[in-house]
Amino acid sequence: MPPPSDIVKVAIEWPGANAQLLEIDQKRPLASIIKEVCDGWSLPNPEYYTLRYADGPQLYITEQTRSDIKNGTILQLAISPSRAARQLMERTQSSNMETRLDAMKELAKLSADVTFATEFINMDGIIVLTRLVESGTKLLSHYSEMLAFTLTAFLELMDHGIVSWDMVSITFIKQIAGYVSQPMVDVSILQRSLAILESMVLNSQSLYQKIAEEITVGQLISHLQVSNQEIQTYAIALINALFLKAPEDKRQDMANAFAQKHLRSIILNHVIRGNRPIKTEMAHQLYVLQVLTFNLLEERMMTKMDPNDQAQRDIIFELRRIAFDAESDPSNAPGSGTEKRKAMYTKDYKMLGFTNHINPAMDFTQTPPGMLALDNMLYLAKVHQDTYIRIVLENSSREDKHECPFGRSAIELTKMLCEILQVGELPNEGRNDYHPMFFTHDRAFEELFGICIQLLNKTWKEMRATAEDFNKVMQVVREQITRALPSKPNSLDQFKSKLRSLSYSEILRLRQSERMSQDDFQSPPIVELREKIQPEILELIKQQRLNRLCEGSSFRKIGNRRRQERFWYCRLALNHKVLHYGDLDDNPQGEVTFESLQEKIPVADIKAIVTGKDCPHMKEKSALKQNKEVLELAFSILYDPDETLNFIAPNKYEYCIWIDGLSALLGKDMSSELTKSDLDTLLSMEMKLRLLDLENIQIPEAPPPIPKEPSSYDFVYHYG
């Protein structure tokens, strides 16, 4: 008979003693259980002790968290959090440097536990740590090592959100900023200092201003030229935080300062083109910087043109002048009147491809793209003048019905690029899809526009398009761009080459190929064959999903991006009856053994799988921290008794794998986008294999007719 659900069997360790095997009744008070354990080892004063996990982060067990204890867990009897906090408080202020160093090491480790952190903070522990840092006394021995542990403990304690970051003093900020600005500082101190400054900026608007005054652009950029990718990552993270929290009127100034210090080229040469693979966190920070840089365009994108603003109208005049040469300006001709000049302007604006020939300023009153489109056109006209003139004159000399309207095309293309690059949207926590080519040029967006407007003109000619085909051409151009971007070209020239290979005929071929599975096999016999094969394919997909769950996946812990990443791992037992999971010190490179995963959930106990906003950990997050990308990757397992295991998948692929696998375990349909894609691919492949012998044979829409009965059956011979 299985034990009651309130009873869990555990092993409890104590240094120098044999472990106790104990059945814990979860209905009993924790203090009573601790007393029983202490009595087993004849330890007095049981109120001085508590239980904590022996493995992983070694978290303390409280009345609130005791329900997480599972059968087979190994626990430790340990000094209670309040007593440990008191002892460490005394030891961190010891006159003996060895004692103080050991205390700081232990404090840095225990501070990750919220139970201990609460006790230590209640004893004004954070104030003690900040004073130690503010004193800046370079002790004769162990100074760097002790300071590193002090900063680690401080960061761990603050990360729990128990006290506000606003409590830190100017002296503390100056001291931390000093470690960042020093030319020769210990790597571990520099890393923690950068992380602390980033957390301050992200968590307090008032601290942002103080830190912005202390940290210079040059100081941060110098840390990008080192060989340590972790330091580079923290430096870019701080740059991103300062960028993100800067008032709108200051962001452009920051961007200009970064440009003067050649931030982009330093990142390109020392990070992206360095001799090291880009780690996940670095890729995320590069993605964030890319998004924030493009977001500087948002103001122009959302600014309408004022038709009465002469300076803005002069830009349109400049576009006309560059295209058609100042010498042909009618105002230079003797005796030219106002009406004649207006007629000439109208003709030129029509040749430039504006929708409103009389007053082209009206074309820029829609947002997006607003004035950003005009900025792009002027950049092309001035920086790539030959290209601009060629496109305009080439189209103005065509037959009317086949001319590609440059003005209208440029406006719509700018809007399209803003949509594709999501200009104006905040960075997503779970994404790391930066594009190296955007770090190869200070005016990457304008250069991208220049490449794509040439692509549009080329595609227009290949399609032999007319004005009525404008939207069709734009759809093809969008497809060409979105097919080229995922290849992540290293330079704009490589991107241009990729677009050249995606000609209109190639797009048609790709579309045709992708339609094969949908359009080629629609006759009733083929449909019937598909329906017969489909269950086999679904079973194959199901087995693949379950096999992937058996291999397991690594998941990043929520809320730890600003510090060293923490991970946990989950995998399905080979008999498909239990989910094993547990914390990890590092992101694993290979398979994690079942033995190293201490926690488990019986599949029979799983009640439901919820996703997105229905997940408990998404409801807990504030609206400011939520974003669409994280919601799309979130899912939770609800299991008895009223417990949850919360996930945020590293990417959409892993999300689909786990949702499908868990659904299959519960006997539900696999409904992810990946299943639909895999089903279509495998069905199409299987159908083609089975129909190889029928190549060039017309398959009828209906079965052949049944012939009439013969007039007699005299041809039948009966053997005697």
Swiss-Prot record:
Keywords from the named record: Apoptosis, Cytoplasm, Membrane, Phagocytosis, Phosphoprotein, SH3-binding
Primary location group: cytoplasm
Domain PH, residue spans: 553-674
One function term, GO molecular function aspect: receptor tyrosine kinase binding
Record's subcellular location: Cytoplasm; Cytoplasm, Cytosol; Membrane
InterPro entries the record matches: ARM-like, ARM-type_fold, ELMO_ARM, ELMO_dom, ELMO_domain-containing, PH-like_dom_sf, PH_domain
Tissues expressing the protein: Widely expressed, with a higher expression in skeletal muscle, kidney and placenta.
All residue ranges annotated as the ELMO domain in the record: 311-485
Motif (SH3-binding): 700-707
Post-translational modification Phosphoserine, affected residues: S503
Positions where Phosphotyrosine occurs in the chain: Y48, Y717
One Pfam family from the record: ELMO_ARM
GO CC annotation terms, alphabetical: cytosol; membrane
PROSITE patterns given in the database record: ELMO (PS51335)
GO annotation terms (biological process): actin filament organization; apoptotic process; cell chemotaxis; cell motility; phagocytosis
Protein's job: Involved in cytoskeletal rearrangements required for phagocytosis of apoptotic cells and cell motility. Acts in association with DOCK1 and CRK. Was initially proposed to be required in complex with DOCK1 to activate Rac Rho small GTPases. May enhance the guanine nucleotide exchange factor (GEF) activity of DOCK1.
Assembly and binders: Interacts with the SH3-domain of DOCK1 via its SH3-binding site. Probably part of a complex with DOCK1 and RAC1. Probably part of a complex with DOCK1 and CRK isoform CRK-II. Interacts with ARHGEF16, DOCK4 and EPHA2; mediates activation of RAC1 by EPHA2. Interacts with ADGRB3. Interacts with AUTS2; the interaction is direct.
Disorder this protein is connected to according to its UniProt record: Vascular malformation, primary intraosseous: An autosomal recessive, rare malformation characterized by non-neoplastic severe expansions of blood vessels, usually seen in the vertebral column and in the skull. The most commonly affected bones in the skull are the mandible and the maxilla, and life-threatening bleeding after a simple tooth extraction is frequently observed.
PANTHER family: ENGULFMENT AND CELL MOTILITY (PTHR12771), ENGULFMENT AND CELL MOTILITY PROTEIN 2 (PTHR12771:SF8)
Descriptive protein name: Engulfment and cell motility protein 2
